[in-house]
A protein has these predicted regions:
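A short, structured surface patch at a secondary-structure boundary
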Residues: 4-100, 106-113
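Extracytoplasmic substrate-binding proteins
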Residues: 84, 95-97, 105-196
Length: 197
């Protein structure tokens, strides 16, 4: 279950993960988005998630990216140049025809409160995996989502080890920062119209 980040008592989406050979055996009473795992032809829409798939050794299971101009990960850029990963347009202006031809088994998208922007993608009949990790209030909570993404590719063990490494490094850096004499401010993400996002 993915909770709605804007209405904490509501679900944004429920996913029912099943192996391809068991998909037909699931009772119809189970309500939620059915996703056959492991994913083999996914579409990613953020550089952060592309990088995570690289760390999980799953880039061969990426069929396309949205927002290509923001993705600067050498292995993925190389696969795009080789034609192994397609550029399917922008997140809010995807090339629907290209997505139909690609036949993805899932679309990884960031949810937004005004979700009407994905209405055409709903018509594809492809599961949309809402990546609400960016809404987490702490860095470690956001990083822990890598374990969720690991479920979709049957690499939970590797995802768990990656999270443990990130957690260890984060705690070490936090302890070091608390001991520093000067307090610096750090801005991440990007500046848009005078506001950092």
């Amino acid at each position: 279950d993915v909770k709605n980040p804007w209405k904490s008592k509501e679900l944004l989406q429920r996913y029912i993960l099943c192996t391809r050979d068991n998909a037909q055996k699931l009772p119809s009473s189970l309500q939620g988005t059915r996703v056959s795992i492991p994913l083999e032809r996914c579409v990613m829409s953020t550089a952060a998630h592309c990088y995570l798939l690289d760390q999980l050794k799953q880039t061969t299971n990426m069929a396309a990216v949205l927002g290509r101009k923001y993705i600067h990960i050498p292995v993925i850029e190389n696969e795009i140049k080789r034609g192994k990963i397609a550029d399917a347009g922008e997140e809010f202006q995807p090339n629907i025809e290209k997505l139909i031809l690609i036949k993805p088994d899932a679309l990884f998208l960031s949810p937004y409160e005004q979700a009407g922007s994905y209405q055409n993608l709903d018509k594809l009949g492809v599961p949309i995996i809402f990546c609400a990790d960016y809404m987490e209030s702490s860095s470690l909570a956001r990083a822990e989502w890598m374990k969720v993404y690991g479920l979709f590719f049957n690499c939970e063990e590797l995802a768990g080890k990656l999270f443990e490494e990130v957690e260890r490094n984060y705690k070490a850096q936090t302890a070091m920062a608390h001991q520093a004499n000067s307090k610096n401010e750090i801005f991440t993400e990007r500046l848009m119209s005078g506001t950092w996002y």
